[in-house]
Amino acid sequence: MYTQTIYELSQEAERLLLLSLEHLRLLQQLPVASLDGVAQEDGEGNENTRPQHVSGRDVEAQHGTLNNELRKITRLEMVLAIVGTMKAGKSTTINAIVGTEVLPNRNRPMTALPTLIRHTPGQKEPVLHFSHVAPIDTLMQTLQQRMQACDRQHLTQVLEIDKDMNALLQRIEKGVAFERHYLGAQPIFHCLKSLNDLVRLSKALGVDFPFAAYAAIEHIPVIEVEFVHLAGLENYPGQLTLLDTPGPNEAGQPHLQKMLNEQLARASAVLAVMDYTQLKSISDEEVRQAIAAVGKSVPLYALVNKFDQKDRNSDDEEQVRALISGTLMNGSITPGQIFPVSSMWGYLANRARHELRVHGRLPDHQEQRWVQDFAEAALGRRWRSADLDDIEHIRHAADLLWEDSLFEQPVQRLIHAAYANASLYALRSASHKLLNYAQRAREYLDFRYHGLTVAHDALQVNISRVEEDMRQLQVSQDRVSDEVGHEVERMMEAANTFLSQQQADILHRIAPLFR
């Protein structure tokens, strides 16, 4: 019954979205230039009465939003957008949520392009799909030409060239294009690092990166992997997907703010990752402004990362919740939706527990460096290699580290709930976007109706005035015609009288001549 109800509601939502898209197409065809004069006259001195124009940009944005909701409702997909700065540990938090390392960690911005991470049951090894790769190929060809004309010494002065950037430069010189699919963590890391380094390189060479080509969510890279926390759970109607968004002004690219705002507005819910040690910093303030701009259109949650750095003089959990909810977010997020955590501890603990569950032991700490990080966090700085051989001790230490990370609560209340109710989130998101579009369309059409009504009334008044003027003109014309006729008759009579007198006078004078 539940599944059937969800299906019927999704079908109705799909019908309404298609109807709204058709309505938007018709709305786009309405002439708007004629409203400018009305706006200036009617809105003079009153800003609230100015028209709401349907510009090409507005229509494109609304069209993208509705199409995005149509895509989500077709898949019953709940998209949880994750926003935060590089220093807040956004990538680490996503890795902790997924339960394995799907995003690379570097000490520089790593999200020039949004990336989807979709929970795919049974997909143990992550796979990245990058179908819309053509704009990147074109960019690399342009960069290849610029590099041929650019002095390498000059490039080193305007760009930090590390081993990853050097590999990218060699790749561009050789004309090696991006693949459409990458299987495994390391190939995915290499792809994402290269994409982000392309942004830095493009800026250094004065070439525009094709951000606009990736405004649509179906064009951005997608990583499919089974979330460890959701493995083995009951299959629910719907799909859970994380959206890794670019941070505000990330990598010195201020125009990414527009892309961030659009992606947040199109999400089903928003999860902000904040830095416990920098809650009042400028960077975290930019994150707060970004999610505050979304308003009440989507549910908001917050993870306060790096809570493991709390000391006896720092704010505790309740104080942090009160600070963020009240002072920093002005009540736009409730304390119950704020979770202080340690993403690094959560990621390391869950990764270790997963390795123990699947392989029965941890990998060699010399080959996989995360094992060293785990050992230091769970066993202390004085751990030894032999400690890793005590499987029961390691399992217990991983459980304690997971408990200390405080990640269990957000996983249960947010991730599990989002997965179980993904279809409901998708329906809620579609309903809200439909209502928002309907309200904006109604406001615009009401204004159009008001403008046309005012124009019609004014036109009727002007027509009446013209008709009255024509009547007055006719009356004046008739009066003048009578007066002119009368004057002509008087002049004709005077002329005839004068001619008769002259004739009589002439006859009187010439009469003696004929006697």
Where on the chain are the PLM-derived regions?
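Secondary-structure edge/capping motif, primarily at the C-terminal ends of alpha-helices
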Residues: L27-V38, T277, A417, N421, ...
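C-terminal helical "lid" subdomain and adjoining coupling/linker elements of P-loop NTPases
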Residues: L388-S405, H416-A458
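Long amphipathic alpha-helical scaffold segments
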Residues: G45-L80
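Charged, amphipathic alpha-helical linker segments immediately N-terminal to NTP-binding catalytic cores
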Residues: M1-R57
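A non-catalytic, extended alpha-helical scaffold characteristic of dynamin-superfamily P-loop GTPases
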Residues: D446, H450-R515
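Catalytic cores of large soluble enzymes that bind and process phosphate-bearing ligands
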Residues: T5, V54, D58, D316, ...
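Globular "head" domains of long coiled-coil molecular machines
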Residues: N67, R71-N421
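Register-specific recognition of a single heptad position within extended alpha-helical repeats
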Residues: Q4, Q11, H53, E60, ...
